[in-house]
């Protein structure tokens, strides 16, 4: 199969996810709705591109006429790291509904190995090279130490910061002087560690 663009990867991942959840591929309208296309015609163009690259076959005469060229089970074993999008309050970060797509990145490239990717929002960690739009490789663990860059959940928000524990308080430090530390009172505020940062993939590398 020829290499896919990030948008084509999104469409292909949606097809796989829908087939896993419902047993059938999505319609063009469903693809357009899930991925924010203006029309089903836009979805059709992406499907044609996937067919040209050998990822799928298009079966004429039916709205769900999409067939994967490789068995779904084989692809799932090698689908790579999940990219986590917006995380809903109170739900596990790796819940299926949070997974936007998968990137074919070998988890063992990172030490310790990565469990998922998180898209960085904002420039609060720019001084250590973590920029807006980057993909942060994360090792899922709650065993963390002062000074590590962690992915933490504070109240309803997921944030990337450098950890400092002070008794019953946690301070999350930005790596940008324009941002103030986030102080968390463990006695009164919900707080969870989701993992530690183990690498960064520059956003432009995927465009």
Curated annotation (Swiss-Prot):
This is LexA repressor. The gene is lexA. It holds the Pfam family Peptidase_S24. Residues 28-48 bind DNA. One of its GO terms (molecular function) is serine-type endopeptidase activity. The keyword Transcription regulation applies. It comes from Pseudoalteromonas atlantica (strain T6c / ATCC BAA-1087). Homodimer. It comes from the Bacteria. It catalyses: Hydrolysis of Ala-|-Gly bond in repressor LexA. The active site is at 124 (for autocatalytic cleavage activity), 161 (for autocatalytic cleavage activity). Its EC number is 3.4.21.88. Belongs to the peptidase S24 family.
């Amino acid at each position: 199969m020829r290499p896919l663009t990030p948008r084509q990867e999104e469409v292909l991942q949606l097809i796989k996810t829908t087939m896993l959840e419902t047993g059938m591929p999505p319609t063009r309208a469903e693809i357009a709705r899930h991925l924010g296309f203006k029309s089903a015609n836009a979805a059709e163009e992406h499907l044609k591109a996937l067919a040209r690259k050998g990822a799928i076959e298009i079966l004429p005469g039916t709205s769900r006429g999409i067939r994967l060229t490789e068995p779904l089970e084989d692809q799932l074993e090698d689908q790579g790291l999940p990219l986590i999008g917006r995380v809903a309050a109170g739900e596990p970060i790796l819940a299926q509904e949070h997974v936007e797509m998968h990137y074919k990145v070998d988890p063992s490239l990172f030490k310790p190995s990565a469990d998922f990717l998180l898209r960085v929002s904002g420039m609060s960690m720019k001084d250590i090279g973590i920029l807006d739009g980057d993909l942060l490789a994360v090792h899922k663990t709650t065993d963390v130490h002062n000074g590590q860059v962690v992915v933490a959940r504070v109240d309803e928000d997921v944030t990337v910061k450098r950890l400092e524990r002070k008794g019953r308080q946690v301070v999350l430090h930005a790596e940008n002087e324009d941002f103030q530390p986030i102080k968390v009172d463990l006695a009164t505020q919900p707080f969870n560690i989701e993992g530690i940062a183990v690498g960064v993939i520059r956003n432009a590398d995927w465009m």
